[in-house]
Amino acid sequence: MKVVVIIPARYGSTRFEAKPLALIAGKPMIQRVYERAAAASSVTGVAVATDDERIVSAVEKFGGKAVMTSDACRSGTDRVFEAGRTLGLTGSDIVVNVQGDQPVFDPECIDEVTAPLIGDPGTGMTTLAFAIVNEREMTDPKDVKMVFDQDGWALYFSRATIPHDRDGNMEFDTYKHLGVYAYTMDFLAEFCSLPEGHLEKIEKLEQLRALEYGLGIKTVVTAYDSPEVDLPEDIARIEALLKDQ
């Protein structure tokens, strides 16, 4: 069984053009994500999946591996699946999808998210949740919230605050979804064959496709947050976090 991290990376963006190549404390953001992924103990390989030669060039410059994918991929997950096939991954081989805008994530997150699949490939798909400590993230639609059952299976993901405390007198954690997924190649093949879901279209969240079609997502609660770079002004905050590490 192989465990390969694939980092989908797009050059074009309406909010942040060339984001993967933005410098974070002197290194391209994609390099920082790549290096952290490679540091996970469970990983047997790392690759960047992109449709842009500029990103391929940047990755190869720091000694990384890049896979060119079609520019017709409808989502980052489809791009990851295409790259996985190009890399020769099949069956119960595990693909870890790490978003390319998380330059300070802890490598332990990859070991945590892959553990259920390594133990039981029939699990299919896993992801991470983090108990929110910053109140702003409770209501910010950029931070996706999630709920899961007593066995850790995801029930829903939303940009809204869930669950809603109607009476305002309950003590409970609100969980933020972190953009790290692991799947078997068999699961990815099924997922990518499905039409876009109705809830997926509304919330603009790919993972809802799995839930809408009855495919389970096992949730692992992690102690490690994974702040994202959404806009250029986020870089200073990320660089400050790097100094503290």
Curated annotation (Swiss-Prot):
Domain of life assignment: Bacteria
Catalysed reactions, as listed in the record: 3-deoxy-alpha-D-manno-oct-2-ulosonate + CTP = CMP-3-deoxy-beta-D-manno-octulosonate + diphosphate
Cellular localization per UniProt: Cytoplasm
UniProt pathway: Nucleotide-sugar biosynthesis; CMP-3-deoxy-D-manno-octulosonate biosynthesis; CMP-3-deoxy-D-manno-octulosonate from 3-deoxy-D-manno-octulosonate and CTP: step 1/1; Bacterial outer membrane biogenesis; lipopolysaccharide biosynthesis
EC number annotated for this UniProt entry: 2.7.7.38
Keyword Transferase applies: yes
SUPFAM superfamilies: Nucleotide-diphospho-sugar transferases (SSF53448)
A GO cellular-component term linked to this record: cytosol
Annotated transmembrane regions: none
Keyword Transferase: yes
InterPro entries according to UniProt: Cytidylyl_trans, KdsB, Nucleotide-diphossugar_trans
Keywords, ordered alphabetically: Cytoplasm, Lipopolysaccharide biosynthesis, Nucleotidyltransferase, Transferase
An annotated GO BP: CMP-keto-3-deoxy-D-manno-octulosonic acid biosynthetic process
GO MF term (any one): 3-deoxy-manno-octulosonate cytidylyltransferase activity
Major location (coarse): cytoplasm
Similarity-based family: Belongs to the KdsB family.
Functional summary from the UniProt entry: Activates KDO (a required 8-carbon sugar) for incorporation into bacterial lipopolysaccharide in Gram-negative bacteria.
NCBIfam families listed in its UniProt record: kdsB, PRK05450.1-3, PRK05450.1-5, PRK13368.1
Name of the molecule in the record: 3-deoxy-manno-octulosonate cytidylyltransferase
Species of provenance: Desulfatibacillum aliphaticivorans
Gene symbol of the encoding locus: kdsB
